[in-house]
Amino acid sequence: MKISMINYKSLLALLFILASWIIFTVFQNSTKVWSALNLSISLHYWNNSTKSLFPKTPLISLKPLTETELRIKEIIEKLDQQIPPRPFTHVNTTTSATHSTATILNPRDTYCRGDQLHILLEVRDHLGRRKQYGGDFLRARMSSPALMAGASGKVTDFNNGTYLVSFTLFWEGQVSLSLLLIHPSEGVSALWSARNQGYDRVIFTGQFVNGTSQVHSECGLILNTNAELCQYLDNRDQEGFYCVRPQHMPCAALTHMYSKNKKVSYLSKQEKSLFERSNVGVEIMEKFNTISVSKCNKETVAMKEKCKFGMTSTIPSGHVWRNTWNPVSCSLATVKMKECLRGKLIYLMGDSTIRQWMEYFKASINTLKSVDLHESGKLQHQLAVDLDRNINIQWQKYCYPLIGSMTYSVKEMEYLTRAIDRTGGEKNTVIVISLGQHFRPFPIDVFIRRALNVHKAIQHLLLRSPDTMVIIKTENIREMYNDAERFSDFHGYIQYLIIKDIFQDLSVSIIDAWDITIAYGTNNVHPPQHVVGNQINILLNYIC
């Protein structure tokens, strides 16, 4: 017994010495230990974010979420609540345009210009059964093709299978009404779930050049590989892009990029059937006759004030008449472009839809001269000047993700936040930003983060140069039957709502290209010149 006690005490002494040594070692190397923990958790976070920025099972983190991450989380949670899961066992249980019923409330033989026309929509499935929930992606439009007139309608979802569709009768004549079921609520739910599951619908290929050697390598926002990666990071804004590092090639040798769609889908076979051409954009009001709208001897409409920077927008924001855009809340004057732009420095930042503006300016102002910036490719930065009038207009693309089958240079690419940061700004400086189309194939957190970072950069710009005019151009609607999982207008509509929400607290103006292109009925990511010209006319009224 005595020997056992001695052995027990000896064991305790040894354990105490061992514990003391471990504590001493950790204390001496605490910085290294915590750095290692931080690094592993950071890599774990980035490498496991392919399903969602904020997974169902939260990761254990030693660092609290940043303000940006908290805001992203908040926005995604709100969207998740608005787009609940809608599983279905058969297509017959999804919304049917044919079986749904639309009824004009308080119908009349003739309506008066300026009246509100309301339609009650009750949606049913393909078996004719009344649906008990909403969430369908609908598009309402009124038009008079002979008058080259059009406007969007407002859709109110009561979340019980009924909707109120409201039209403002802006003009006289015979008016056609349209209500399209773009996607049933089950399709909306499937698109939302699929979007946030993967970053690999688009494959990026980077070209690395070192002397006479040229190598191509896989790149992307997230790469699920154990290979060594080149990391192109903006640590401040927490944005990144990655390429598999080529052998015997430095990461700085990346010069060009192109992309293509990958044969991958996160939709089930049953879900895919909802996005076949015959099931997308189906007319609900096909049997409706045109309605007649008259002046009705109403008093002359009061003159509206001229459109100016900072005005708020309504829904709908205006209408097309004789192919010309007419806002609801103000009137657009005819502006002489050359004189309006005299002494102005115009920055056009974004995708190819804002590059259309650049091309329009160059085609419309014969005194603008293009400056060779010694770049190559379709997406090269553009600069045009009129030295006599001191006009300077430039377009630059934004940083990843930038989708394009044609090879483009990345040597001059930068995040828009950095371009805004180095802009001095003053009363004759105008910045127009367009984000959206290239983000549609990726999880929504990528777009939200970019929008928040741009918001912060604009906020800083307006603090140091409050006279700078910043205009946000929203997305155009695009082709309806083109690869819904990647490019559906549903994705664009969510981004449109996010933009309006994020930028509402800043002194910026929004050009509602979404509503404008619905009114024109273009269904083209690159609308025709007359539509682009009307978008630009809003800009000219804002800045002159």
Swiss-Prot record:
Database matches in Gene3D superfamilies: Immunoglobulins
Main subcellular location of this protein, as a coarse class: secreted
Entry-linked InterPro entries: Ig-like_fold (IPR013783), Ig_E-set (IPR014756), NXPE4_C (IPR057106), NXPH/NXPE (IPR026845)
Record: glycosylation sites: 29, 38, 47-48, 92, 160, 210
Pfam families, per the entry: Neurexophilin (PF06312), NXPE4_C (PF24536)
Protein localization: Secreted
Record's keyword annotation contains Calcium: no
GO cellular component: extracellular exosome
The protein's name in its UniProt record: NXPE family member 4
Species: Homo sapiens (Human)
Highest classification ranks of the organism: Eukaryota, Metazoa, Chordata, Craniata, Vertebrata
